[in-house]
Amino acid sequence: VDPGAGHLEQLEAAERQLLVFAREINHLYQAERARAAELERALDRLRGSYLDMIKTLAFVVEAKDPSTRAHLQRTHDYACALAEAVDPELAADEQLRYGFLLHDVGKVGIPEAVLNKPGPLDAGEWEVMRAHPLLGVQMVAGIKSLGSAVEVIRCHHERWDGKGYPSGLAGEAIPDGARVFSVADAFDAMTSDRPYRKAIPFDRACQEIADGGGSQFDPAVVEAFTAIVPALPELHASLHGQGAGGSGPAGAGAGPGAVDSLAHSIP
């Protein structure tokens, strides 16, 4: 018997086994790819449903408070642009962007007589209005996947100097996303008409934000805001559906003063 022939047969048998094994591996790989693709499609559907839910919650807020119609989308877009300037990783946080849309969800629990009052709120009404951040947190408490969005809902009225609400947080104790959003929120408040006052000019609103650095706002966020000011007129005009160059004249009683008297007085 030729010993070489036996060795060749062994090699051929091993080759056949390897081919069978390779086919099985390829079959498993293709099956896993198909499974992963189906899971990705299911995840996309889930993300779409989740985003629809977020948008529905935001719509409920705007439906209850007509004076802030489109405010949620505008502040979301301003905040996203500002977050990108502050820290691209922050801007990439999907949960945070949900928080930008849902920041005022707690207003659903505020009486319409307070929300839609055509004038400044009295002390008692202010106390009611100041409850909306914590009401919002309670409303979304069951949505575990919101993550950092809850920080924006809770803390978007906190101030760098600790004089905000609901918790009186100061400085870096305020979550990053909320620090970014408070600037975007104030800017939109100042450049939008409200029932009891007209919007102030774009340039003046930018100056008010700059003046609020270190008191109402995080100085680093204000610095980032100042850096994107040249790009803001186009975004501002598109969100307000008008030509660039300002929001129109300030209304009666909107004379010189700190940002507090214009933006932060708007709940």
For each of these PLM feature ranges, what is it?
Residues 23, 44, 51, 58, ...:
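Metal-dependent catalytic cores of enzymes that make or break cyclic nucleotides
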